[in-house]
């Protein structure tokens, strides 16, 4: 597992209060992990802080799964 993927999964597990083993690449934040809109905002903020990148609102709305976050961060990390 890449360092980015590992860090994303750790953030998701911590923010969502779920076990790390439930945070799979294809886990969707809302459907699989029980996130609400506030959780999504907090996840994006945590990703921005951890990886030193800015995620525009229109892009953040499209990040709905762990794999979406890993892909975006991998392509846009400073």
Swiss-Prot record:
Modification comment: 4'-phosphopantetheine is transferred from CoA to a specific serine of apo-ACP by AcpS. This modification is essential for activity because fatty acids are bound in thioester linkage to the sulfhydryl of the prosthetic group.
Asked if the keyword Lipid metabolism belongs to this entry, the reply reads: yes
Keyword terms: Cytoplasm, Fatty acid biosynthesis, Fatty acid metabolism, Lipid biosynthesis, Lipid metabolism, Phosphopantetheine, Phosphoprotein
Q: Which residues form the Carrier domain?
A: 2-77
Q: Which Pfam families match?
A: PP-binding
One GO cellular-component annotation of the UniProt record comes to: membrane
GO MF annotations, alphabetized:
acyl binding; acyl carrier activity
Q: Which residues carry this modification: O-(pantetheine 4'-phosphoryl)serine?
A: 37
Endpoints of the signal sequence: none
Main localization is: cytoplasm
One BP term from GO: lipid A biosynthetic process
Under which pathway is this protein filed?
Lipid metabolism; fatty acid biosynthesis
Look up the domain of life of the source.
Bacteria
| Compartments it resides in | Cytoplasm
What is the protein's known function? Carrier of the growing fatty acid chain in fatty acid biosynthesis.
Q: Give the protein family.
A: Belongs to the acyl carrier protein (ACP) family.
Name of this chain's protein: Acyl carrier protein
User: Which species does this protein come from?
Assistant: Magnetococcus marinus (strain ATCC BAA-1437 / JCM 17883 / MC-1)
